Amino acid sequence: MKKRVNTYLAIAITTYCNYQCFYCKKGGESISKEKETISFDDVKKIIANAYANGIANFRITGGEPTSVSYFCELIEYIMKFKDTKVRINTNGFRILEYIDVLTKYKEYIDIVFSVDNLSEYICGVHFPKYLSQNVIEITRALRKNKISVRYNIVVTKLNECEVRELVQKAIDELDVNVKLLDLNRFSEYLGYSNEVTGKEAYDLWQELFVPMSNFYDFLCQISTHSQAEWTTSLI
């Protein structure tokens, strides 16, 4: 197998999620809007075919992938292939149930944890993925077992006021990496209380969008890397 450099395959194994974040869309990262989970046999075929074509890096996402019954078996299956690596995108739901298999393959696995802010509510808007005590304990358990953890923070005008403090707490107190993400522009969002589509979705995006350039000075202050190393050319 000729390995493809810097190429990975993202697989949304389920559209089910235990959270309903206002900035997300139906199905999460899946292109499907139906409530469904890909069968384990189908996922194995996808992985085997991808590996045969030079892909050895896999990102497992959803929905919430840790809610899928075959999650543990999936990790074991991917690790059977030589030189594979796995990134798991999760909100932390049930992740500690799999601590043994994650620790077993910790050299080849990293966890991307969605954590958006310090407070559960900002301006009356619910943020399910906040830095709760439970999230802190899960993070510490993963790091205690030497498992790589990164927080993904989706920045909006609502939580922008807490992002800097969250970043510093994550790095200094919890020993995790952090990635700031701007708000994806979708044609639909789950919304604050009801789903919004079309022009309403665009209006919501405009209302909430924050350019990453707002954080460049802050990142320069706390990072030992140059701007070219921690950002793209897109502002």
Spell out what each predicted region is.
Residues 114-116, 120-235:
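Radical SAM enzyme [4Fe-4S]-AdoMet core and its adjacent flexible, acidic
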Residues 1-5, 22-23, 86-89, 142-147:
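Conserved N-terminal glycine/acidic-rich loop preference
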Residues 7-11, 58-60, 86-88, 111-113, ...:
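Hydrophobic faces of well-ordered beta-strands that scaffold small-molecule active sites
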Residues 45-62:
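Short Fe-S-cluster ligation motifs
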Residues 50, 74, 78, 102, ...:
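Hydrophobic positions in alpha-helices of CheY-like receiver
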Residues 2-41:
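Canonical Radical SAM [4Fe-4S] cluster-binding loop centered on the CxxxCxxC motif
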Residues 31-45, 65-107, 114-122, 127-134, ...:
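Canonical radical SAM enzyme core domain
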